From Swiss-Prot:
Glycosylation sites: N45
Key words, A-Z: Disulfide bond, Glycoprotein, Hemostasis impairing toxin, Secreted, Signal, Toxin
Organism: Macrovipera lebetinus (Levantine viper)
UniProt key word Secreted: yes
Function as written in the Swiss-Prot or TrEMBL entry: Interferes with one step of hemostasis (modulation of platelet aggregation, or coagulation cascade, for example).
Domain of life: Eukaryota
Lineage of the organism: Eukaryota, Metazoa, Chordata, Craniata, Vertebrata
Main location: secreted
Domain (C-type lectin) ranges: 34-155
Subcellular localization, as worded in the UniProt entry: Secreted
Oligomeric and partner information: Heterodimer; disulfide-linked.
Name of the molecule in the record: Snaclec A4
Statement: the UniProt record of this protein carries the keyword Transferase: no
Recorded family membership: Belongs to the snaclec family.
Length: 156
């Protein structure tokens, strides 16, 4: 019995080492894992509302990415940079933050309902939706026209 437990444990160690940390196994194929969440950059051009809807259709708890820390912001920026190769000088990627009132102030929560704990936006003319800008290597948030089609990142 002791030998059986050792062999089973040994196989588990080999399996986990072959599959990385084991965290990726919870993500759908083509998605990337980071601190218990899964992310995917979509090279489809959609308006903010259509991108939000598309993300909710990907999985039960899917939503446009909400960025809660500098560490997560860096992860998302790298993921976007790796997955969007063909870009224009002024290229943008939707995130899940949108202004909800007439004065263009951001709502107090992300599109998934979570609170805004981290902020990294560029002051600019008032638009309603926020995205990542290529000129900042996808690290700063910029105000954009919600009706313009851009690529986007979903999180589950």
């Amino acid at each position: 019995m002791g030998r059986s437990i050792s062999v089973s444990f040994g196989l588990l160690v080999v399996f986990l080492s072959l599959s990385g940390t084991g965290a990726d196994q919870d993500c759908l194929p083509g998605w990337s894992s980071h601190e218990g969440h899964c992310y995917k950059v979509f090279n489809l051009n959609k308006t903010w509302e259509d991108a939000k809807k598309f993300c909710t259709e990907q999985a039960n708890s899917g939503h446009l990415v909400s960025i809660d820390s500098k560490k997560e912001a860096n992860f998302v920026a790298e993921l976007v940079s790796q997955n969007i190769k063909e870009t224009r000088r002024t290229d943008f990627v939707w995130i899940g933050l949108r202004a909800e009132d007439k004065r263009q102030h951001c709502s107090s929560e992300w599109s998934d309902g979570s609170s805004i704990n981290y902020q990294n936006w560029i002051e600019a003319e008032s638009k309603k939706c926020l995205g990542l800008e290529k000129q900042t290597r996808y690290r700063k948030w910029v105000n954009l026209n919600c009706g313009q089609p851009y690529r986007f990142t979903c999180e589950i």
